Amino acid sequence: MVEYNRIFCVLVIFSTTIKCEYSELMNQKIGVRVEVLNMIYENETTITSTGHPRCRLTLHKSGWDRDTCSSPQFKLNDTLSWSTRVCYKWVCDTTKYAMRVESCWIGSPNMSVYILRDDGCTIEKAILTSPVYTSFNRAAAIGWMAVRQKNMKYMHVGCTIRLCHLCDPKCQTITPPRTCNDNRADDYEAMWNSSSRVKNLCFPEPSTTENLNLNFGNSPFQNVGNIIILLLVFLLR
């Protein structure tokens, strides 16, 4: 049985002994395991031609700086209590694509509780905040591992990453999400409008070499050479 953000207490009376299963779950410390990220690509053809970006989710110890998750990362043998603050950090190693974190869950693979919707916004703020995007390929959120299953040893965490190319006009409407009611829509619009990465990748200026070739092709020396060739042809006729 999974306990999710509500009080559930079964009282079993043996003479004068009262056993509260909820209390046991609350006091239980468990390990955490991050599942392999599920990747979704908006344009398979573009992704195939440029290679698949590598993305990862890391969990960090409690800290209030959710924009960077600057606290140390949890180690394999660390355990978490019900009230442990956790910073989720998502990173994709790419300069050509933007990511959106969506459909995240915690619990066990067979009995999971979703904490992010498929639009990238939180389902329950008491469990996880909506991710904050500091760039097109980095996001972070603060949450608690407030899900317990009886006899659970490890809490599993899984997420989906949706990738779109920065030059795809639809990409700007996909990520970062503007519908999460986190007062960051204006920041995300500015991220797109002022991005030098998008400008250089999608609207590159002509290179210096191209300019030199263009100027040389229109130079007066070339015109003089053409005139001389015409005169020689005329005299030899």
Curated annotation (Swiss-Prot):
InterPro entries: Cuticlin (IPR051962), ZP_dom (IPR001507). One of its GO terms (cellular component) is Golgi apparatus. It is found in: Golgi apparatus, trans-Golgi network. Its main location: Golgi. Expression detected in motor neurons. Keywords: Golgi apparatus, Signal. Residues 1-20 form the signal peptide. PANTHER family: CUTICLIN-LIKE PROTEIN 19, GH04558P. This is Cuticlin-like protein 19. It comes from Caenorhabditis elegans. The lineage of its organism: Eukaryota, Metazoa, Ecdysozoa, Nematoda, Chromadorea.
